[in-house]
């Protein structure tokens, strides 16, 4: 739906985790059961209420980019606001009135995109009225010319135009069909391609190592003697880095695809390589390394969730995107199991059993993050292979679609 409506610029998400944390701190502090009940009911209720508004709209208006930039500015403002609030809450103990005030301001920011939508609707209405007024004036002028006695009945050769031949019409139709039907694969057809498995392997390495990092953030912080406040800040800020990765990767890849013709898998190569560096930074165990490493890993992890769905729709088509996309997302739990359980959990338990119940020091997670750094580098190489395999496809098909 998003790909069809916003064909020239894909959407983003990922900031909801930080918003829900603020909702818990304000409304359900110390009541986890109430919070879990809200999480169970609220998404379903919102979907039922708003599902009638979900449909395919033609968003190719003259002001589309301006309105999308407005949404982006609001989203970045929310991310910056949440980052400041999370840091303040983990440094100071905010009173109830302050938490309520910050949450109300957050709600105002969340609903502010409605203002952009209403403004866009008014602009479209005014544009339609102006167009109708111009057409009415033209019809009036034409009627006056017809009823006027001073008109010429001489044949004007300029009025005769040659109609396009049947061959040219057929040719244009066949070109359009080629662009529409190109690479519209179903799940079984996609799974028979090398591109599918390259993308799947890259996602196992990228998403799996990212989930392993956030799932073990508390234990990593404890082993490196970080305070509880610092650990809470790291966990809370993960949603911010996740969102910035999703937003940034989508925006940057869209920009370079439209302006430079760069195939989108190239940015998957870059982000997975940076994620490998982030894992090496965490493995070093240097003072402050967990802060820097978590930022790199969090941003690059979020990037995969922005790049993968878009690449899937572009390479395999949108007709069966739902099944293909959800099949590729299996890479996330598979990678999480491999890295969280079989790598990080196994090595930590082994080190903890030798030292007692808990493990302290860089040796607890150094080997695990070295392994994950190697895995993300492997994922980057898989994405590099996908880039070279699809480079000509992007130049010949995707860019032609965007220019239609």
Q: What spans do the regions from the language model cover?
A:
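Intracellular juxtamembrane helix-capping segments at the cytosolic ends
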Residues: 1-8, 17-21, 50, 213-217, ...
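Glycine-rich segments within core transmembrane alpha-helices of 12-TM secondary carriers
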Residues: 2-52, 62-86, 241-245, 322-344, ...
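Extracytoplasmic gate region of multi-pass secondary transporters
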Residues: 5, 82-98, 177-251, 305, ...
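Interfacial helix-cap and linker-helix signal at transmembrane-aqueous boundaries
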Residues: 23-29, 86-92, 221-222, 252-257, ...
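Symmetry-related core transmembrane helices of the 12-TM Major Facilitator Superfamily/SLC fold
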Residues: 35-52, 69-81, 98-115, 361-386
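Long, low-complexity inter-transmembrane loops of multi-pass membrane transporters
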Residues: 54-192, 198, 393-404
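Structural signature of the two symmetry-related core transmembrane helices
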Residues: 263-280
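Helix-loop junctions at membrane interfaces in 12-TM secondary transporters
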Residues: 282-293
């Amino acid at each position: 739906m998003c790909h069809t409506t916003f064909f020239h610029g894909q959407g983003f998400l990922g900031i909801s985790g930080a918003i829900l944390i603020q909702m818990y701190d304000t409304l359900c502090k110390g009541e986890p059961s109430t919070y879990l009940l809200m999480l169970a009911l609220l998404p379903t209720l919102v979907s039922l209420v708003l599902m009638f508004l979900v449909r395919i709209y033609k968003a190719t208006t003259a002001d589309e980019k301006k309105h999308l930039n407005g949404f982006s500015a609001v989203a970045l403002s929310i991310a910056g606001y949440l980052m400041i609030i999370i840091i303040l809450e983990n440094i100071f103990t905010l009173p109830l009135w302050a938490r309520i005030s910050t949450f109300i301001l957050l709600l105002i920011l969340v609903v502010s995109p409605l203002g952009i939508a209403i403004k866009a609707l008014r602009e479209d209405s005014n544009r339609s009225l102006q167009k109708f007024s111009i057409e009415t004036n033209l019809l009036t002028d034409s009627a006056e010319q017809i009823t006027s006695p001073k008109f010429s009945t001489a044949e004007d050769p300029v009025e005769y135009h040659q109609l396009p031949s049947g061959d040219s019409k057929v040719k244009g139709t066949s070109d359009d069909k080629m662009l529409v039907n190109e690479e519209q694969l179903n799940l079984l057809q996609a799974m028979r391609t090398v591109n599918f498995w390259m993308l799947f392997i890259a996602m196992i390495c990228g998403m799996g190592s990212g989930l392993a990092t956030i799932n073990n953030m508390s234990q990593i912080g404890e082993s490196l003697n970080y305070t509880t406040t610092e650990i809470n800040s790291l966990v809370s800020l993960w949603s911010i880095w996740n969102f910035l990765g999703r937003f940034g990767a989508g925006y940057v890849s869209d920009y370079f695809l439209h302006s430079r013709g760069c195939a989108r898998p190239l940015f998957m190569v870059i982000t997975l390589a940076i994620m490998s560096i982030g894992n090496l930074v965490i493995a070093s165990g240097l003072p402050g390394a967990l802060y820097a490493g978590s930022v790199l890993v969090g941003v690059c992890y979020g990037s995969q969730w922005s790049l993968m769905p878009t690449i899937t729709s572009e390479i395999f088509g949108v007709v069966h995107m739902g099944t293909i996309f959800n099949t590729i997302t299996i890479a996330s739990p598979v990678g999480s199991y491999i890295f969280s359980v079989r790598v990080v959990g196994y090595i930590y338990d082994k080190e903890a059993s030798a030292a007692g119940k808990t493990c302290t020091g860089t040796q607890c997670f150094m080997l695990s993050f070295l392994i994950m750094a190697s895995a993300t580098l492997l994922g980057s190489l898989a994405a590099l292979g996908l880039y070279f395999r699809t480079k000509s496809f992007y130049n010949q098909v995707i860019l032609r679609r965007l220019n239609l």
